[in-house]
Amino acid sequence: ETYTVKLGSDKGLLVFEPAKLTIKPGDTVEFLNNKVPPHNVVFDAALNPAKSADLAKSLSHKQLLMSPGQSTSTTFPADAPAGEYTFYCEPHRGAGMVGKITVAG
């Protein structure tokens, strides 16, 4: 299944919309650049069930999306450990642009 997460709210807030999402292993999350770019999506190496820097890196998209309407997607591996994965936008992390994806077991 594919889910969409907007980068920046429709009202221009520095948030992921939705900020929390529950998926299954093998699902895809499309990150759609919406408002107040630039944005990127970085998964926290310490805040994932495997505490794996390699897994976090493989899920992340560090390149900045500059224009509204640009998107990038992440497919969670079929063997992704169940639990909570925290991600953030590097330029706007200090403003609270952080989200969580829960992979159901």
From Swiss-Prot:
<keyword id="KW-0249">Electron transport</keyword>
<keyword id="KW-0793">Thylakoid</keyword>
<keyword id="KW-0479">Metal-binding</keyword>
<feature type="binding site">
    <location>
        <position position="39"/>
    </location>
    <ligand>
        <name>Cu(2+)</name>
    </ligand>
</feature>
<comment type="similarity">
    <text>Belongs to the plastocyanin family.</text>
</comment>
<feature type="binding site">
    <location>
        <position position="89"/>
    </location>
    <ligand>
        <name>Cu(2+)</name>
    </ligand>
</feature>
<dbReference type="InterPro" id="IPR028871">
    <property type="entry name" value="BlueCu_1_BS"/>
</dbReference>
<dbReference type="InterPro" id="IPR002387">
    <property type="entry name" value="Plastocyanin"/>
</dbReference>
<feature type="binding site">
    <location>
        <position position="92"/>
    </location>
    <ligand>
        <name>Cu(2+)</name>
    </ligand>
</feature>
<comment type="function">
    <text>Participates in electron transfer between P700 and the cytochrome b6-f complex in photosystem I.</text>
</comment>
<dbReference type="GO" id="GO:0031676">
    <property type="term" value="C:plasma membrane-derived thylakoid membrane"/>
</dbReference>
<dbReference type="InterPro" id="IPR008972">
    <property type="entry name" value="Cupredoxin"/>
</dbReference>
<dbReference type="GO" id="GO:0009055">
    <property type="term" value="F:electron transfer activity"/>
</dbReference>
<keyword id="KW-0813">Transport</keyword>
<feature type="domain" description="Plastocyanin-like">
    <location>
        <begin position="1"/>
        <end position="105"/>
    </location>
</feature>
<keyword id="KW-0472">Membrane</keyword>
<protein>
    <recommendedName>
        <fullName>Plastocyanin</fullName>
    </recommendedName>
</protein>
<feature type="binding site">
    <location>
        <position position="97"/>
    </location>
    <ligand>
        <name>Cu(2+)</name>
    </ligand>
</feature>
<keyword id="KW-0186">Copper</keyword>
<dbReference type="InterPro" id="IPR023511">
    <property type="entry name" value="Plastocyanin_cyanobac"/>
</dbReference>
<dbReference type="InterPro" id="IPR000923">
    <property type="entry name" value="BlueCu_1"/>
</dbReference>
<dbReference type="GO" id="GO:0005507">
    <property type="term" value="F:copper ion binding"/>
</dbReference>
<dbReference type="Pfam" id="PF00127">
    <property type="entry name" value="Copper-bind"/>
</dbReference>
<dbReference type="InterPro" id="IPR001235">
    <property type="entry name" value="Copper_blue_Plastocyanin"/>
</dbReference>
